[in-house]
Curated annotation (Swiss-Prot):
Residues 58-117 bind DNA. This is Homeobox-leucine zipper protein ATHB-21. It comes from Arabidopsis thaliana. It comes from the Eukaryota. The keyword Transcription applies.
Length: 220
């Protein structure tokens, strides 16, 4: 029994000195063995995540720019939206920034600039559309008004035409014109004019118009 106690004591001492090498089973009062609790080691993914958070916190502190640095970057961005490697290094050196920080700032600034262009274009198209809709409504209203005027003008023309027709049918002038049109105008055959030797006495000639009758000589 003494030897067993010594062995257990030695194993317990070894497990305490080297917990990762050997984990003994410590007997409990009921005779059941209970494994000792080992400390969990962090996985590589957890370690990398923590390191990334630490680096991210440091990078966040580096991203804070002064008003003068932002103003100089804005001026450089207005000159050219693209950022070449040489220009990036030069700006970083002049402003005392990290080249990667300058590149990230330009990338974010270009994204905001593109979004602003899209918003401006959308606003312009929206205003043009609204103006077109208003103009279309105005033209539609004008067309309706012109159609009403045309309809009233056609009705007025019809009323005037009926009035003129009724006036002409009841006018005494039109009746006399109709009677005179039916009366035959007398000519030489209606008069007793002889064509013997006395014909010259019954006809009167005007010397002023004798020359105008030369064209009848071809029929005589």
């Amino acid at each position: 029994m003494n030897n067993q106690n010594v062995d257990d004591h030695n194993l317990l001492l070894i497990s305490q000195l080297y917990p990762n090498v050997y984990t003994p089973l410590v007997p409990q009062q009921g005779g059941e063995a209970k494994p000792t609790r080992r400390r969990k080691r962090k996985s590589k993914s957890v370690v990398v995540a923590e390191e990334g958070e630490n680096e991210g916190n440091g990078w966040f502190r580096k991203r804070k720019l002064s008003d003068e640095q932002v103003r100089m970057l804005e001026i450089s961005f207005e000159d050219d939206h693209k950022l070449e490697s040489e220009r990036k290094d030069r700006l970083a050196s002049e402003l005392g920034l990290d080249p990667r920080q300058v590149a990230v700032w330009f990338q974010n600034r270009r994204a905001r600039w593109k979004n602003k262009r899209v918003e401006d274009e959308y606003t312009k198209l929206k205003n043009a559309y609204e103006t077109t809709v208003v103009e279309k409504c105005r033209l539609d209203s004008e067309v309706i008004h012109l159609k009403e005027q045309l309809y009233e003008a056609e009705r007025e023309i019809q009323r005037l035409a009926k009035r003129v027709e009724g006036t002409l049918s009841n006018s005494p002038i039109s009746s006399s014109v109709t009677i005179e049109a039916n009366h035959t105008t007398p000519f030489f055959g209606d008069y007793d004019i002889g064509f013997d030797g006395e014909a010259d006495e019954n006809l009167l000639y005007s010397p002023d118009y004798i020359d105008g009758l030369d064209w009848m000589s071809q029929f005589m």
